[in-house]
């Protein structure tokens, strides 16, 4: 697995530079009142001038679901998804409203209306205690709905997990940062505790993919190689036609059982 976990130092430096320093003129940075005049706090769900120049766009503006809908729906299943304090909140299943017959209101994954090819995606997330969720990409709605009547996306998944308590931590390729069910994250990763914000990044260009967690690359893969073909053949995706041959699809936030929050969701085409 060593070749899958190579740390790309140059990319790390570029990534840091891309999200630094210059703020949008419409939302200026402010000093953090902690006795450190050198530290500033940047507004959430905004783009800096540098990010705009580099081609970044917001997928979530902090106040609306513009650009999103439920997978298999024309609208957002708002019984399961809410906007709260500048975040997208996935409501825990136990808190979802009940219908008159006692069944929970319909839910499902939250999907971008647009599809993307050759992109870099960044976002921040925090998970609930023993929580499990994910961000899926290269998703075909048609394939997903044909194989998942519960409005669940089929695509490559960046796993988001409370590694300390969720039972999925027993499977290396199911831990936070993993390419779910395919490649485990680098063992040296840094995962923030429950209740704190993690920063994640996906790079997907041509046959090449990368997962980053809190500034460090934790997964690297190349589709079409004998190694990747072998991993796919042993995974949950092995019987899904064209799963790994498509190079464009939707970005999806997973509707799992647990509560999770998302913010600062940004993308740029490479």
PLM feature segments, named:
Residues 11-20:
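Hydrophobic h-region of N-terminal signal peptides that target proteins for export
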Residues 1-8:
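Bacterial N-terminal signal peptides that target proteins for export
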């Amino acid at each position: 697995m060593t070749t899958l976990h190579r740390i790309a130092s140059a990319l790390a430096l570029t990534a840091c530079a891309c999200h630094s320093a210059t703020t949008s003129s419409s939302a200026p940075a402010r000093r953090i009142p902690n006795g450190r005049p050198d530290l500033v706090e940047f507004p959430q769900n905004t783009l800096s001038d540098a990010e705009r120049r580099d081609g970044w766009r917001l997928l979530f503006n902090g106040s609306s679901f513009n650009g999103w809908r439920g997978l298999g729906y024309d609208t957002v299943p708002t019984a399961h998804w809410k906007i709260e304090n500048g975040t997208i909140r996935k409501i825990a299943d136990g808190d979802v409203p009940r219908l008159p017959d006692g069944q929970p209101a319909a839910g499902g994954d939250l999907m971008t209306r647009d599809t993307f090819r050759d992109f870099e995606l960044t976002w921040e997330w925090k998970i609930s205690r023993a929580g499990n969720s994910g961000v899926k990409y290269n998703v075909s709605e048609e394939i997903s709905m044909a194989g998942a009547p519960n409005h669940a996306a089929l695509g490559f998944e960046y796993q988001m997990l409370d590694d300390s308590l969720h039972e999925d931590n027993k499977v290396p390729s199911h831990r936070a940062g993993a390419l779910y069910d395919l490649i485990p994250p680098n063992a040296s990763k840094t995962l923030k505790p429950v209740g704190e914000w993690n920063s994640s990044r996906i790079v997907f260009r041509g046959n090449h993919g990368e997962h980053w967690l809190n500034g460090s690359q934790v997964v690297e893969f190349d589709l079409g190689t004998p190694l990747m073909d072998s991993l796919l053949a042993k995974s949950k995706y092995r019987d899904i036609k064209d799963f790994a041959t498509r190079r464009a699809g939707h970005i999806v936030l997973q509707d799992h059982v647990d509560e999770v929050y998302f913010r600062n969701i940004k993308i740029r085409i490479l």
